[in-house]
């Protein structure tokens, strides 16, 4: 027996490779009734039996999000059958209408295909795309005298827009705020012959064009006004720049101290009151000086320097012993420091009597060195 020829005897019939699927073929038209834009692809069916005439317009989104603003109805797309499949099953289908035709109150809504209760419920849930300023302007423009009171504006909004019937407190406060803050609405007092409560509100003639499309367009400031504000701010920043201001420095020659001729007044040196401690210190230093002068040897230069320092200290005391007025006593240490640091005394300065007694006479040996 030839093993090569054995698989040829067990060949499967050709009909068993492609079994029929009658059930799936029958389901495709039924699915077209419920799935409008759904394409069910079957790989076992011939492509000639499939409709491929879909267009982009069938999948476009409606530009207007509100149903009652007047958009076209639902577009039916063709399915597998030559006739287009309806959006609703045939048992419940009805002739399609445009959702909203133009009406006087809302700018377009013909809900004849819905019951009255369904229409009212739909309008209560959908908020009108108008601002509160636009609602006020619409109510005033539709009035005969072009003026309304606050209660009449409330009544107009509630009657023409059912959305505002459910919660009156919130939107009524917004209406009042817009009337008081918006410059386009002017308050008119009542006449004497017109009894009633509340003033009238009217629309400014200069703002009528701001409500052309129903919505309120905010009024822009003129360019000249904005330019003037910018120039004023720049001038203020230039005159007094922030962060660059420094506190005024206190100088000895302030404008208050200047004389009428423009020269500053120089105060005289104040007096210094001496304590007994300072007197004892001077006496001890004099005693040390007299003791060192008696020594001989290499300490002669040191004795000379100490003698000069003592003479400078005595000159400081003698120069400040002049009597001065009491108003200069507080600043005595500030104006009278320079004589203290001068080590060489002047010839014109005289020592007080009590200091002359403390200093001994210099010997002729050291007088020649000066």
UniProtKB/Swiss-Prot annotation:
Induction: Induced by Bmp-signaling. Suppressed by Wnt-signaling. Keywords: Developmental protein, Differentiation, DNA-binding, Neurogenesis, Nucleus, Transcription, Transcription regulation. Its main location: nucleus. Residues 127-221 bind DNA. It comes from the Eukaryota. GO terms for biological process: anatomical structure morphogenesis; cell differentiation; determination of ventral identity; ectoderm development; nervous system development; positive regulation of DNA-templated transcription; regulation of transcription by RNA polymerase II. The keyword Transferase does not apply. Residues 349-370 have a biased composition (Low complexity). Initially localized to the animal hemisphere (the presumptive ectoderm) of early-mid blastula embryos. Becomes restricted to head placodes, excluding the otic placodes, by the tailbud stages. InterPro entries: Fork_head_dom, FOX_domain-containing, TF_fork_head_CS_2, WH-like_DNA-bd_sf, WH_DNA-bd_sf. Transcription factor. Essential for ventral specification of the early cephalic (head) ectoderm during gastrulation, playing a role in the non-neural versus neural cell fate choice. Binds to DNA via the target sequence 5'-[AG]TAAA[CT]A-3', with 5'-ATAAACA-3' being the preferred binding site. This is Forkhead box protein I1-A. The lineage of its organism: Eukaryota, Metazoa, Chordata, Craniata, Vertebrata. The gene is foxi1-a.
């Amino acid at each position: 027996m030839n093993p090569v020829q054995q698989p040829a005897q067990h060949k499967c019939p050709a009909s068993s490779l492609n079994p029929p699927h009658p059930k799936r073929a029958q389901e495709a038209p039924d699915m077209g009734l419920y799935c409008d834009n759904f394409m069910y692809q079957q790989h076992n069916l011939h492509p000639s039996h499939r409709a491929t005439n879909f267009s982009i317009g069938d999948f476009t989104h409606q530009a207007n999000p509100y149903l009652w603003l007047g958009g076209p109805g639902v577009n039916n797309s063709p399915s597998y059958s030559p006739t287009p499949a309806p959006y609703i099953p045939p048992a419940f289908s009805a002739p399609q209408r445009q959702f909203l035709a133009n009406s006087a109150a809302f700018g377009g809504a013909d809900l004849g295909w819905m019951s009255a209760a369904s229409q009212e419920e739909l309008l209560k849930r959908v908020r009108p795309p108008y601002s509160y300023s636009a609602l006020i302007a619409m109510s005033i423009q539709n009035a005969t005298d072009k003026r309304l009171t606050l209660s009449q504006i409330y009544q107009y909004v509630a009657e023409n827009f059912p959305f505002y019937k459910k919660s009156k407190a919130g939107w009524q406060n917004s209406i009042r705020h817009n009337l008081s803050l918006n410059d386009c609405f002017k308050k008119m007092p009542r006449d004497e012959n017109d009894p009633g409560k509340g003033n009238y509100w009217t629309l400014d003639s200069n703002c009528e064009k701001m409500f052309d499309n129903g919505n309120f367009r905010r009024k822009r400031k003129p360019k000249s006004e904005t330019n003037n504000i910018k120039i004023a701010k720049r001038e203020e920043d230039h005159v007094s720049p922030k962060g660059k201001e420094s506190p005024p420095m206190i100088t000895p020659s302030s404008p208050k101290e200047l004389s009428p001729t423009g020269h500053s007044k120089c105060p005289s040196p104040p007096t210094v009151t001496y304590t007994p401690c300072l007197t004892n210190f001077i006496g001890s230093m004099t005693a040390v000086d007299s003791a060192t002068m008696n020594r001989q040897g290499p300490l002669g230069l040191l004795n000379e320097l100490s003698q000069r320092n003592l003479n400078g200290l005595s000159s400081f005391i003698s120069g400040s012993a002049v009597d001065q007025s009491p108003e200069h006593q507080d600043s005595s240490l500030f104006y009278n420091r320079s004589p203290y640091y001068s080590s060489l005394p002047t010839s014109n300065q005289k020592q007080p009597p009590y200091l002359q007694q403390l200093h001994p006479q210099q010997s002729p040996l050291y007088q020649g060195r000066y």
